[in-house]
Regions:
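Post-signal peptide N-terminal segment of mature Sec-exported envelope proteins
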Residues: 28-50
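A residue-level signal for beta-strand positions that form part of recognition/binding surfaces
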Residues: 9, 32, 64-66
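C-terminal motif of bacterial Sec signal peptides marking the signal peptidase cleavage site
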Residues: 15-18
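C-terminal or internal capping secondary-structure element at the end of a domain, subdomain, or sheet
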Residues: 136-160
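N-terminal membrane-targeting segments
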Residues: 20-25
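Surface-exposed short loop/turn segments
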Residues: 53-55, 59, 63-112, 116-134, ...
Length: 160
């Protein structure tokens, strides 16, 4: 690269910093969190737990935030024809979570992630099963990403 390109990168970086731009995620944004294993051992609860536990990094001190969550799944038939044949099915997954201080167990934040999606129903039962599993798995990944964003924002606001 030429020196001109390098100086424009530095100028761009300086400009973004002077405007107050800071990326949401950095090395510290998801550190200092511990997720409690859910009492409900459903497949969805365990997927959420593993997804969060793998992304969150506890601190070596006892100054961590403890996350607890509950999950609610709802399945609804939509797009029903006059002959009562269901053409689509909707899945909605809601995860409510709370953050407590590890030191004194004081609840300091509550949040919720609600994601829904639908899939087409067909005459083949196995195809419906696969479509439902794929849709549910996709929703769970989106819920995990949403909760991680909320935790990063929480952590960022704690520093202010």
């Amino acid at each position: 690269r030429s020196g001109c390109d390098w100086s424009s990168d530095v100028c761009s970086s300086d400009l973004l910093q002077s405007c107050g731009f800071q990326p949401l995620y950095n090395i510290e944004s998801l550190s200092g969190f511990i997720v409690n294993e859910p009492n409900n051992k459903s497949e969805s609860s365990l997927i959420i737990y593993k997804g969060l536990d793998g992304a969150l990094k506890p601190l070596s001190t006892s100054n961590n935030f403890i996350i607890s969550f509950t999950i609610d799944e709802q399945f609804e038939d939509i797009d029903i024809r006059e002959d009562e044949k269901v053409l689509r099915k909707n899945i909605a997954i809601s995860v409510k979570f709370s953050i407590k201080k590890e030191i004194d167990e004081e609840e300091i934040f509550t949040g919720e992630s609600l994601i829904s999606s639908a899939y087409n129903r067909v005459a083949e039962p196995y195809a419906n099963f696969v479509a439902e599993q794929d849709t549910r798995d996709r929703i769970l990944l989106l819920v995990i990403q949403d909760i991680k964003r909320q935790l990063a924002l929480f952590k960022k606001n704690q520093g202010k």
